[in-house]
């Protein structure tokens, strides 16, 4: 008996998160003949683990964003709900704790724009408004990227409808954050999640 069939409605190259998510969406729309090709002996891509000496080690991804509580789902959480996948999510009540020995920084930053701005303001008084505006700028640029990535548009329309995106395009994260004239202590509290992706702020595009 042959393992592969002569015909598939869809062939997906790569069994990582994007490939499996695409297969899920296709199945939800009624496509059943799907083949996922993956060169590794395990699917999942960077979302993988291994077992050594009886201990299971997470090799990479260990946290997911954009889930949200039931009834107030965010993008990723809504995707799993729409696909009929019931996951018992373990919520993380705060994004991170930042500790800088010798600099007097040991602060837990909580979820929510205003809450995070208050956390930083408590350690750096007088920074609340600037921090909040910086976070909101990040949100506006993120939302613009969501639209621009799937919507063809002229440069004029982009300038008119997404001015913040155009304004910061081409600048590094450190260049943009410096325009807010925040004390270094506040910058040190804001930026740990950014360098989490593996690039220093000077090299990381905003």
Language-model-derived ranges and their functions:
Residues 2-140:
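N-terminal glycine-rich phosphate/pyrophosphate-binding loop and immediately adjacent elements
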Residues 102-205:
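Rossmann-like flavin
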């Amino acid at each position: 008996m042959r393992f592969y069939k002569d015909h598939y409605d869809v062939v997906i190259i790569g069994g990582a998160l994007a490939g499996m998510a695409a297969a899920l969406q296709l199945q939800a729309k009624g496509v059943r003949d799907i083949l996922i090709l993956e060169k590794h002996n395990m699917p999942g891509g960077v979302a993988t683990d291994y077992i050594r000496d009886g201990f299971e080690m997470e090799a990479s991804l260990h946290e997911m964003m954009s889930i949200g509580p039931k009834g107030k789902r965010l993008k990723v959480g809504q995707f799993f709900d729409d696909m009929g996948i019931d996951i018992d999510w373990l919520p993380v009540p705060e994004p991170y704790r930042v500790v800088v020995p010798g600099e007097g920084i040991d602060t837990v930053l909580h979820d929510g724009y205003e809450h995070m701005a208050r956390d930083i303001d408590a350690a750096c008084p007088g920074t609340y408004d600037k921090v909040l505006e910086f976070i909101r700028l990040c949100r506006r640029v993120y939302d613009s990227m969501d639209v621009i990535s799937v919507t063809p548009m002229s440069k004029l329309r982009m300038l008119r409808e997404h001015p913040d995106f155009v304004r910061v395009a081409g600048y590094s994260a450190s260049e943009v954050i410096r325009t807010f004239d925040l004390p270094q202590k506040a910058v040190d509290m804001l930026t740990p999640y950014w360098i989490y992706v593996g690039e220093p702020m000077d090299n990381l595009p905003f």
